[in-house]
């Protein structure tokens, strides 16, 4: 296993089992033809959905949203009944949201008007790897390099979650220590080029981490789903660990082969178009669209593989909680032939670079005895 210990692997497997159990407590609402046959049946379905997802709507709001719920329920049921795609949808917690609300709340938060920071580490370190020599499948979860699925809530902070997945991953690979890191530090403190819940870019976040002495743990600086005052110095006093990186590199744009080269070696941050209804209500299987390339959501690729039907896929970690998709993940079709990859997954990929396990801490972090990773 190299630097990643068997203890880390067991811990990650236990966490995955617990996550699945938690998801089952909020299972998908089954739908049959009879559930959509009448207004009365649809109202009953809506009430069951609200109960299952612990959603409370006032009378007027409930009636206003019912029309959207009906439309979404028909869309999901029709897709699943046709069975002409290798993936299924379900009536998840977004069930009574229209796409405009969903986009404003959970996606559409990458700052396309702000240029990303150029890579501080030049080149593409995996360029010389022969694609034919790469393993046929990779899953960094099984190697103990991925923490549990998190939930960004109603905050446009996907960029921070995407960044953190990649940094947690390379840190675990280099040090053998899987540490959950703080998205909240990025939201509160990385404000020069990123904008908290209003959006940001992963490349800029990597450079913040490099230039500001690393990233603190989630335990010391927990997530609040809202932007607040940067208090990393105070939080650092209670944190035994801070994780450093050397910078970042970009994967050559629009190349799924180069993305595979990188993912074979570490988790990679990517941007996708995630605002479509099919992505919104994804449940299981290999996602084959529909989606475009208007990049609006930051996620992370933590592996790749081939499904039983022979369809290749990317394993993507999302930040919408473990009740979405396949316990918080989506398998996106790999090598689809689409320019930039399906949903634009290969258009703007990047990853943190970490060559040493314990670099010298910067003075900003010198606030008592702490371990530097």
UniProtKB/Swiss-Prot annotation:
Upregulation: Synthesized by the aleurone cells stimulated by gibberellic acid (GA). Repressed by abscisic acid (ABA).
Signal peptide range: 1-28
EC number: 3.4.22.-
Glycosylation positions in this chain: 130
SS bond list: 155-197, 189-230, 291-343
Binding site for leupeptin: 158
Keyword hit for Protease: yes
PTM entry text: Autocatalytic proteolytic cleavage of N-terminal activation peptide.
Practical and industrial applications: Orally administered proEP-B2 may be well suited for treatment of celiac sprue; can be expected to remain active during the gastric phase of gluten digestion but be rapidly broken down in the duodenum.
GO biological process: proteolysis
Pfam families (alphabetical): Inhibitor_I29 (PF08246), Peptidase_C1 (PF00112)
GO MF: cysteine-type peptidase activity
Keyword entries, A-Z: Disulfide bond, Germination, Glycoprotein, Hydrolase, Protease, Signal, Thiol protease, Zymogen
The keyword Metal-binding belongs to this UniProt entry's keyword annotation: no
UniProt-listed PANTHER family: CYSTEINE PROTEASE FAMILY C1-RELATED
Cited function: Autoactivated endoprotease able to hydrolyze alpha2-gliadin, a recombinant wheat gluten protein, with a preference for Gln-Gln-Pro-X-Pro-Gln motif, cleavage occurring after the first Gln residue.
Protein name: Cysteine proteinase EP-B 2
Gene name linked to the record: EPB2
